């Protein structure tokens, strides 16, 4: 009996010990068990569907839908890239793709060339903005989406694409055989001088070797135009490769300067990036323009130069993308672009605006933390970069907006270019009074109409007033407002002539001088650039901002 009792006691103690041990063993294995369990469930569902579902299954579509739905629970930057989208991955990282070099759009159910890139196959073959692509390699495009048409235009460099084209104003279609090339989107959209000593570089994306393009532009501005101050325009620059941002920063800050730190879940994701070369322009005054679309590598560059009190940041608060992605190879030539780390500026700031693990709302300003720049200025984390000088957009939704969005301006520019072989240079081109009147007549002949946004809100207000029972007492006032808010097209074409002319001249200039010409023209009316010029010209103001 004693022996049995001891055995029972030992067994009982062993059970207790094992039970106490289980939580500690399982704690490290729980997540792997959950992964295995859910994989089993997913595979079981697929098996049951394959065996029992009444119709055949679209396996590829089902799998991609399941993966994409899963990734939507994380953040918008973690994405699955199937083999069919491999070209998009190449474009994302290098800025290169195989194609004809043209931007296309859908207009009235047709695929139209919005803009051929200068010097690219489309432009060299004689294709023009406004040309309608009727067929690509015998496939009719009527009703096709832009992505469908784009996939047919892209392909292996050196291969031919046969196009059937309809040109506005001409009755017959014609054919073009265009040889695809490796198309490289130029990261520097424009560079030039804004005054005798101030350079300007508009930088659109941080793709592979884009820092070299920046260096070449800056070198030319210094050697040929003798600039000694620089405005870097990062507006609408959504970022790209971190290394390119570091290489640009290294031109202006001391060797071994910390630019950005990455911190992730695994050790391999933790990295510190410092400059490795002596700066070429350590004393050049810098001003960086940013807006709400400046993100990622743009914020790394602007944030580092702000933290080191090396550049004045001007514009609007940036996007707030403080997450870094790596591309991981998957089976069957597919890829996963996955968020692996958060980045931190030299002062220790993480600029991520939205917490995707929580309620997916932007971090309110009162919950952000303070950090100090090199010379003691206060900056904050969470929510992007707050500029040293904030600018506001001159937001207008008048008739010019509707003329643009309804492609009236685009169509008139097509007609204008067909009847004018040449125009003046971008910095001198102007529409005459007679030419503007011709545009007015064109708009009237097109039976153009539009409804003011304020009128739409007024109708909503009228409905709410009726629901609340105040219709009788407010009806006459609302009717007066309705009459006042009816667009008078003839009057509005004159009242908002300045805004309309700017858009129209810009579109016309692009037909002759392409993107660079358009950028040069638009600088003339860019209020932010004018404000930036005033700041960078004022040495005392620059000093007061950077070293208060």
Which residues does each PLM region occupy?
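Residue-level recognition of conserved beta-strand edge/terminus positions
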Residues: 136-137, 382
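Extended, small/polar residue-biased N-terminal targeting/export presequences
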Residues: 53-114, 158-190, 523-533, 541-548
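Polar, glycine-rich mid-to-C-terminal structural blocks
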Residues: 297, 309, 316, 320-377, ...
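Conserved functional hotspot residues or short segments at active or partner-binding sites
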Residues: 350-351, 355-548
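Short linear motifs in exposed loops
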Residues: 115, 144, 177, 339, ...
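Structural motif
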Residues: 130-132
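Bacterial Sec-dependent N-terminal signal peptides
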Residues: 1-33
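Cleft-lining beta-strand/loop regions that shape enzyme active-site pockets
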Residues: 28-38, 42-59, 82, 112-115, ...
């Amino acid at each position: 009996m004693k022996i049995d009792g001891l055995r029972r006691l030992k067994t009982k103690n062993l059970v207790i010990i094992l039970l106490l041990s289980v939580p500690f063993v399982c704690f490290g294995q729980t997540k792997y068990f959950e992964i295995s369990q859910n994989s089993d469930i997913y595979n079981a569902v697929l098996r049951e569907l394959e065996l029992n579902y009444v119709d055949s299954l679209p396996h590829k579509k089902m799998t991609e839908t399941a993966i994409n739905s899963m990734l939507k629970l994380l953040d918008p930057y973690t994405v699955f890239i199937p083999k069919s989208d491999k070209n998009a991955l190449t474009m994302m990282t290098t800025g290169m793709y195989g194609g004809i070099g043209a931007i296309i759009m859908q207009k009235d159910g047709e695929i139209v060339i919005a803009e051929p890139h200068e010097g690219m196959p489309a432009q060299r073959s004689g294709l023009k903005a406004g040309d309608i692509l009727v067929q690509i390699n015998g496939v009719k495009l009527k009703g096709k989406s832009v992505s469908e048409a784009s996939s047919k235009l892209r392909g292996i460099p050196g291969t031919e694409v046969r196009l059937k084209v309809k040109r506005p104003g001409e009755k017959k279609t014609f054919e073009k055989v265009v040889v695809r090339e490796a198309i490289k989107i130029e990261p520097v959209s424009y560079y030039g001088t804004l005054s005798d000593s101030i350079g300007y570089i508009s930088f659109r994306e941080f793709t592979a070797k884009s820092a070299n393009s920046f260096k070449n532009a800056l070198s030319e501005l210094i050697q040929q135009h003798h600039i000694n101050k620089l405005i870097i325009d990062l507006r609408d620059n959504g970022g790209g490769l971190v290394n390119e941002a570091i290489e640009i920063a290294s031109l202006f800050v001391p060797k071994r300067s910390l630019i950005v730190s990455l911190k992730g879940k695994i050790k391999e994701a933790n990295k510190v990036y410092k400059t490795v070369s002596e700066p070429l322009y350590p004393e050049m005054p810098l001003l960086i323009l940013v807006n709400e679309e400046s993100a990622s590598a743009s914020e790394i560059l602007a944030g580092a130069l702000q933290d080191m009190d090396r550049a004045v940041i001007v514009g609007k608060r940036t996007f707030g993308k403080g997450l870094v992605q790596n591309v991981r190879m998957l089976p069957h030539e597919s890829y996963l672009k996955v968020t692996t780390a958060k980045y931190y500026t030299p002062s220790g700031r993480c600029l991520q605006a939205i917490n995707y693990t929580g309620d997916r709302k932007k971090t309110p300003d009162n919950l952000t933390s303070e950090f100090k720049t090199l010379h003691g200025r206060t900056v904050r984390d969470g929510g992007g970069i707050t500029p040293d000088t904030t600018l506001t957009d001159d937001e207008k939704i008048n008739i010019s907006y509707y003329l643009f969005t309804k492609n009236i301006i685009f169509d008139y520019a097509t007609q204008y270019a067909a009847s004018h072989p040449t125009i003046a240079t971008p910095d001198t081109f102007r529409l005459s009074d007679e030419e503007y009147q011709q545009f007015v007549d064109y708009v009237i002949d097109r039976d153009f109409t539009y409804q003011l946004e304020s009128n739409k809100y007024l109708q909503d207000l009228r409905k709410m007033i009726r629901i609340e029972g105040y219709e009788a007492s407010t009806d006459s006032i609302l009717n007066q407002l309705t009459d006042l808010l009816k667009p008078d097209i003839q009057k509005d074409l004159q009242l908002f002539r300045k805004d309309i002319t700017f858009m129209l001249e810009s579109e016309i200039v692009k037909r002759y001088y392409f993107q660079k010409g358009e950028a040069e023209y638009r600088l003339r009316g860019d209020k932010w650039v004018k404000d930036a010029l005033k700041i960078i010209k004022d040495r005392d103001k620059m000093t007061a901002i950077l070293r208060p």
